[in-house]
Amino acid sequence: YEAALSAAGCFIRMYPLQKEKGFLLQDDFCDDLTDDLDLVFLCNPNNPTGLTIPQELLLKILDNCRERNIYLVLDECFIEFLPEPEKVTMQGKLDEYPNLLILRAFTKIYAMPGLRLGYLLCSDEDLLDRISRSMQSWNVSIPAQMAGLAALNEDAYVKEARELIGKERAWMKAELEKAGLTVWDSCANYLFFEGPKGLAARLEKGGILIRDCSNYPGLADGYYRAAVR
């Protein structure tokens, strides 16, 4: 999002999450919602931590955004990995908050990232029309469309994937903690942890790839994200 906004010439204000606060979004986020803002991006669950934002805080943020005519873009691309995503998603608030935009993806839960298939939810039809008119004419490939239609019939797969990833995530977290690493309680298909500096480069030599998170705002060398497979 930072790259896209920068390319459009937007002024960007960051809100780095803090280790001493568990890398959780805090109530003081609302203090940063000033009248000079047009758009706010939040990721729920967060990437790279996998932590979710409490609904009470999200509603408070939504109210503040609505009062100041700020659009809130909520990235829920990893929400399907939660045991009960319907209890966390803000999809039920779309009619109440026309300033709410929700991003969802097929590519995460259905494990087909190369096809690049996702969608936007919003109750502001005029805004959706303006967004549609600014997009490329052929923005979704036919293979992606066919894969998306097929994926909609895979309810059993989604259920099995959630259960398997939940089980493997708990095992992987326990094993990383046994190795002396600090691991946060992710709800997604990855784990965020703190370890020795240079760990990603050393593991790569052994054929193991993890995400070095040192280029995330507020993070330094020694923070990593590992996929749960």
Positions of PLM-derived features:
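Substrate-binding/gating loop at the entrance of the active-site cleft, primarily
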Residues: 1-10, 138
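Active-site pre-lysine segment of PLP-dependent enzymes
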Residues: 6, 23-36, 48-72, 76-109
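Hydrophobic residues in well-ordered beta-strands that form the structural core
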Residues: 14, 74, 102, 210-212
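Short beta-strands and strand-loop turn motifs
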Residues: 14-16, 39-46, 72-76, 184-186
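Conserved PLP-binding catalytic core of the aspartate aminotransferase-like
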Residues: 19, 165-166, 170, 174-207
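PLP-dependent aminotransferase class I/II
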Residues: 99-184
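Conserved PLP-binding active-site segment of the aspartate aminotransferase-like
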Residues: 123, 192-196, 206-229
